[in-house]
């Protein structure tokens, strides 16, 4: 799944008949290039088939830039903290932005406290939810996504062609989320901010710079789309069928 394969995958790669890698970056690290196929990560069909215009109409986006931010089902405290500062900046400057944010189950009370502390509130330009249960629709509506960089999240961003600011989780094996995110940044599809460098001011500056450049988000989204492997499931299925039919 990841750009940086773990120890177990590296060990198993030596003894299996075929290895499936999510990206070309993982092939060399797996140590078995002659039997490794780049197949991407399969995404849900609804991710590939969402109507963007309908999705934007459903959230009443109009001509506004739609920013979608989340830190996972439980929430990520640091993401909630810096997104709160971003929301306060957006409202203080009356920006033409619709911000959709999911706090996660552990972040509900925290975000309410941050609203009071930073003097902003949900309303016409800010929707705050505990959990996103219609992610395909919101991804389709979004212009910019702020999130962690798990492999499947990135596969969906690529499939949708969405610009992103990626904040890799520091609490994962071998820092693999950082290497996942780096692939998108190197392709001009994302900006990576490691959590050790993350502040509200830095996030505001990053978003501000992106919004100030006409066409920047669309360009990044196009770059993300170029990384998508839409036929991932077909590639995997074909390789497996070939394998079982081989004497």
Where are these regions (language model features)?
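A donor-sugar binding/catalytic signature common to diverse glycosyltransferases
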Residues: 135-176
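A short, well-ordered alpha-helix in the C-terminal region of glycosyltransferases
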Residues: 216-230
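C-terminal alpha-helical cap of glycosyltransferases
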Residues: 229-247
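Short, structured coil segments at secondary-structure junctions
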Residues: 14-16, 31-34, 95, 122, ...
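Short, well-ordered beta-strand core segments
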Residues: 19-20, 36, 145-146, 164, ...
């Amino acid at each position: 799944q990841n750009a940086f394969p773990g120890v177990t995958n590296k060990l198993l790669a030596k003894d299996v008949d075929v290895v499936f890698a999510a990206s070309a970056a993982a092939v060399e690290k797996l140590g078995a290039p002659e039997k490794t196929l780049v197949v991407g990560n399969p995404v849900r069909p609804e991710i590939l088939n969402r109507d963007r215009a309908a999705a934007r109409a459903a959230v009443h986006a109009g001509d506004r830039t739609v920013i979608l931010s989340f830190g996972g089902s439980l929430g990520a405290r640091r993401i909630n903290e810096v997104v709160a500062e971003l929301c306060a900046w957006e409202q203080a400057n009356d920006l033409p932005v619709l911000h959709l944010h999911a706090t996660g189950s552990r972040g509900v009370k925290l975000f309410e406290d941050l609203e009071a502390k930073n003097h902003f509130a949900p309303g016409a330009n800010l929707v705050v939810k505990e959990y996103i249960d219609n992610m395909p629709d919101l991804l389709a509506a979004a212009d910019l996504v702020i999130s962690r960089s798990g492999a499947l999240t990135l596969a969906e961003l690529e499939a949708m062609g969405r610009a992103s600011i990626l904040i890799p989780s520091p609490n994962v094996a071998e820092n693999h989320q950082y290497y996942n995110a780096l692939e998108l940044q190197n392709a001009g599809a994302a900006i990576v901010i490691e959590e050790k460098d993350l502040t509200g001011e830095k996030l505001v500056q990053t978003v501000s710079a992106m919004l100030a450049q006409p066409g920047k988000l669309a360009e990044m989204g196009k770059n993300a789309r170029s990384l998508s492997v839409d036929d991932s499931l077909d590639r995997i299925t074909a390789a497996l069928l070939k394998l079982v039919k081989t004497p």
